[in-house]
Amino acid sequence: PVTIRESVEGLLRVVNSYYSNKIEGNLTKPSELIALVDDSTEHKSKGLLEIKRHIEVQVKLNFENNPREDVAKQDFIKAIHKAFYAECTPDELLVSSSDNAKFYEIEPGEYRATGVVVGQHRPPKPDLVPTYMSWFASAYKIEYLHGLSKYYAMAASHHRLAWIHPFLDGNGRVTRLFTD
C-alpha cells in the first residue's frame, strides 16, 4: 500500500510542477492536471506535456541514486536540464531572440553559447558561465555546510543559479528543480 508520505510527495510533485510551469507562462488548468495524473488524456497540450516532463524529472531526481554531495556540481545541474528537455521535439527546442529576429536551438544539458537578457538582468557572458558554475559548485558543496548554514545556502544557491542563467532556456525550471 502507498504510505501517507508517498501520497503527499506525489501530490507535492504535481503542485510544484504546476506552479513552476505557471511562472513560465504555462496556462494549464488544475482540472487538466487531474487528467494528466490519471493518464486519461490522449491528446496532451504543449503545456500539459511540459508539466508531465517536469514531474518525470522530479521523480527521476528523487529515485535515482544521486549522492547528496553532488547536488551543486556542474554535471548534476546539467543533468537536470538534459532530463527536462530530453523528450522534446526539434520544434520545442527552438527559442527566439527577444525581437524574434533570430532563432536558437536549446542543447539539452549544455550551457548557452550566446548572451541573453532576462528583464533588466544581463547574466554573465557565455564564455564565463563554466567559470561561474565551477565557483557555484565549490561555494555550495554540501559537506562544507552545517546547521542553519545549509538553509541559508539553499536560498542563496537558488538565487545565484538563477542569476548565472547558465542555459539558453529552462533556467527557472532547472533552478526550481535543483532547489526541490
Model-derived regions, located:
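FIC/Doc superfamily catalytic core
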Residues: 1-180
